[in-house]
Regions:
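A structural signal for well-ordered alpha-helices, especially hydrophobic packing surfaces
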Residues: 37, 58, 62-63, 95, ...
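Membrane-interface, cytosolic juxtamembrane amphipathic helix immediately N-terminal to a transmembrane helix
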Residues: 100-141
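Extracytoplasmic ligand-binding sensor domains of the Cache superfamily
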Residues: 54-82
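Juxtamembrane/interface alpha-helical elements of multi-pass membrane proteins
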Residues: 1-65
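Residue-level recognition of alpha-helical structural elements
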Residues: 22-25, 47, 69, 87, ...
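Charged, amphipathic alpha-helical oligomerization/scaffolding segments
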Residues: 28, 35, 53, 90, ...
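Short, non-transmembrane cytosolic segments of multipass membrane proteins
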Residues: 74-104
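Bilayer-spanning, highly hydrophobic alpha-helical transmembrane segments
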Residues: 2-11, 125-151
Length: 151
């Protein structure tokens, strides 16, 4: 009986942490796109220069688990633990065309994808609070119902 309740609580904690990781990951990638835009706009840096100038903490917040910096941004996205597939699709689309056009066009593309990802971030964050409450309540309630039915 106690094991069922502990299992429900553990699953509840795991589900809530997953929702939090998803929201934090999307926020970190928004910050990454802001930095990319800033470095292209202000300093005219290439994608390789931008990648090597990124803060390790930002990469960890994005879910990067590698020891060495990847060679390009697509490799970075491939090695990150991204919990939100819509955000991953936006990022893959952006980085697949990044660095293949003139500076002015790159800035426009950065703004476009940053706007898309920011809208998605607001959606994910607004849903996160409700999902955390739902998962915390539902998992514990189901384990309690199971205990009542079994005993």
């Amino acid at each position: 009986m106690l094991l069922i309740l502990i299992g429900g609580a553990a699953f509840s904690i795991f589900a809530v942490q997953t929702v939090e990781k998803r929201a934090q990951s999307v926020k970190a990638f928004c910050e990454l796109l802001r930095l990319v835009k800033e470095r292209v706009e202000c300093f005219g840096m290439s994608s390789g220069q931008i990648l090597h100038s990124l803060d390790r903490e930002l990469l960890l917040a994005c879910g990067y688990r590698g020891d060495e910096l990847p060679n390009d941004f697509l490799e970075l996205i491939g090695e990150c633990d991204i919990y939100d597939q819509s955000a991953k699709a936006i990022l893959l689309e952006f980085f697949s065309e990044f660095g293949k056009s003139y500076r002015a066009e790159q800035i426009k593309r950065c703004e476009y994808y940053l706007d898309r990802l920011s809208k998605h971030e607001r959606l994910v964050c607004s849903r996160a609070a409700d999902q955390k409450k739902l998962y915390a309540t539902l998992c514990l309630s189901l384990s309690l119902v199971l205990v009542i039915l079994l005993f």
